[in-house]
Each structure stands twice: as C-alpha cells, then as structure tokens.
C-alpha cells in the first residue's frame, strides 16, 4: 500500500502491470460526430462482462458517448457492478459459473433482445477502450452514437444478413 501511494498508481488484484511514470492518455484534437438528428442506436447494446467491475472499459466509453446500453453479468458479480452502474442497466443471467464461456451468455442476450421486440442487437466485449473511424486518411475517435446508427441503417437495407461484425483493430 505504501508503494502504491508513493508512485500514485491504483493497483488491484486484477492489475497485470503498472507503468511509471504513468502514461498520459492521448488527447485528440478532433472527434467524428454524426450530423444526423437521432444519433443513438435503434437496437439495444449489450456488454457481456464477468469479473471486471473495477475496469468497465466498454461501459465507461459508452457512458462518455451518452449511448444507452445493458451490461450482462452473472449473479455472483451483481454486488461488484451495482455500486458503479445504474441498476436499470444491469441484466443478471439466470445461471452462474456455467463453464460454457461467453457463448451461452450471448444466446441469452439474443433471447432477451427478441423478447423486447427487436430484430437485431449489438453484443460487445467488456474490454473496448474507444471506438474510432477512419476519415480523410485519419483515425478519429467518435464523439457520439452516430457510428452505430449508420451501421444499423446500412445493414437494414439488406434482407439476408444473419450476423454482421464490426471489425476490432487494436
């Protein structure tokens, strides 16, 4: 504890490493913002998470962009998430520690989305720091939910899309 106070770095049991001096996050001069009136996605966004209540990378990003979402967790993680996330945004799976991986959770999300009357939905991992768009030969972070809305409107033009994947580049 004394060491972490000395170097001014928060360390938890899940911290794989620390950097000293701390890295300064890149400050972007520009953001890509959608020009449409309604920039929020029309389909629900689900973030499937397990044991990452301390980091919540994707959730922090979506909240910064004012994009509505649901976080899908197992019952044993509820206490960890309820103190930092609005309870209306938390969906608790009906099972815990199934050992089946994320596939069973994604199937549950699919059923939940269909029961709410949606024909599509977004499913994201819980380790996404930011979303970017390549525009004018420059990589720009997005400033609102317009990117999701544009993708939805593109996919909705076609009838035979079963699954659509937005690429993840790190």
PLM feature spans:
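Short, solvent-exposed loop/turn segments at secondary-structure junctions
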Residues: 52, 127-129, 170
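Short, hydrophobic beta-strand segments that form beta-sheet elements in well-ordered domains
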Residues: 45-49, 68-75, 164-167
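Conserved alpha-helical elements of sugar-nucleotide-dependent glycosyltransferases
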Residues: 54-57, 105, 150
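Residue-level signal for alpha-helix termini/capping positions
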Residues: 63, 114, 156-159
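Active-site-proximal specificity loops/subdomain of glycosyltransferases
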Residues: 73-124, 129-146
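Conserved acidic residues
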Residues: 43, 119, 162-164
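N-proximal low-complexity "stem/linker" segments adjacent to membrane-targeting elements
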Residues: 1-64
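Conserved catalytic core of nucleotide-sugar-dependent glycosyltransferases
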Residues: 131-170
